Amino acid sequence: MSTLPRELVVWPIRCYQRFISPCLPPACRYVPTCSAYAAEAVLTHGVVRGLLLACRRLLRCHPWCAGGYDPVPPPRHSGCAVPGASATATARHATAQELSISHGK
């Protein structure tokens, strides 16, 4: 997949971070900052999903929010996915009660 569209979208964000943001007082209530979040979201998730995540974050960042640590979510395809497995399938360990039932105790 080409990274050119992602880089084209991230370029204005980097310009803002380098030239405009240093002239403004710190205002973002989140870590990472909204501009860093937007750049990371686009690079991680692609242009469309990344911009949607960035817009959602900007709508949450206002004077009445608590703020705090809010990282970019991991890509949907990350993890221990098995080809052909359903997206909602999760592995789990048997409980002690299930083990005792299966062993006839």
UniProtKB/Swiss-Prot annotation:
Protein known as: Putative membrane protein insertion efficiency factor
Family: Belongs to the UPF0161 family.
UniProt keyword terms in alphabetical order: Cell inner membrane, Cell membrane, Membrane
Superkingdom of this protein's organism: Bacteria
HAMAP family: UPF0161_YidD
UniProt KW Repeat keyword: no
GO cellular component: plasma membrane
PANTHER family tied to this protein: MEMBRANE PROTEIN INSERTION EFFICIENCY FACTOR-RELATED
Keyword Signal: no
InterPro entries from the UniProt entry: Membr_insert_effic_factor_YidD
Pfam (any one): YidD
Major subcellular location class: membrane
Membrane topology note: Peripheral membrane protein
Cited function: Could be involved in insertion of integral membrane proteins into the membrane.
Record localization: Cell inner membrane
NCBIfam families on file: membrane protein insertion efficiency factor YidD
